[in-house]
Amino acid sequence: MQLNNLKPAAGSKHAKRRVGRGIGSGLGKTAGRGHKGQKSRSGGFHKVGFEGGQMPLHRRLPKRGFTSLTKEFTAEVRLGDLAGLPIEEVDLLSLKQAGLVGEMVKSAKVILSGEIDKKVTLKGIGATAGAKAAIEAAGGSLA
């Protein structure tokens, strides 16, 4: 076997179909475009989503939702993650150093997810009602 003798397997390659080249080809005259109509004309196309003048679906349906501008600057911290911290007084800086919130975060809130059994004092951090009750039950407080 030599490189100049290599050929693709029989039937694996198909010749490009040439349209509009006589009736014997099966795609002569109208070249597979049918008779008349916008799609048969040269340059005949319509925009994506165009429905023939009918009000398009994306305009018939109402707008919904929005993008929050504060999303990347706020974070939530799980109660179980607080229990794993080696410090007793928790503020935003200590959460950033522990890697629990991102560097861009300006405010955080503790949510009731997991358990806490050690005393923790939160400074400048919010907490949900359930998380606040759990922290106070463990002997901690919110400052």
UniProtKB/Swiss-Prot annotation:
It comes from the Bacteria. One of its GO terms (molecular function) is rRNA binding. Pfam families: Ribosomal_L27A. Residues 21-31 have a biased composition (Gly residues). Keywords: Ribonucleoprotein, Ribosomal protein, RNA-binding, rRNA-binding. Disulfide bonds: none annotated. One of its GO terms (cellular component) is cytosolic large ribosomal subunit. Residues 1-57 are annotated as: Disordered. The keyword Ribonucleoprotein applies. Gene3D superfamilies: 3.100.10.10. Belongs to the universal ribosomal protein uL15 family. Binds to the 23S rRNA. Part of the 50S ribosomal subunit. This is Large ribosomal subunit protein uL15. It comes from Ralstonia pickettii (strain 12J). The gene is rplO.
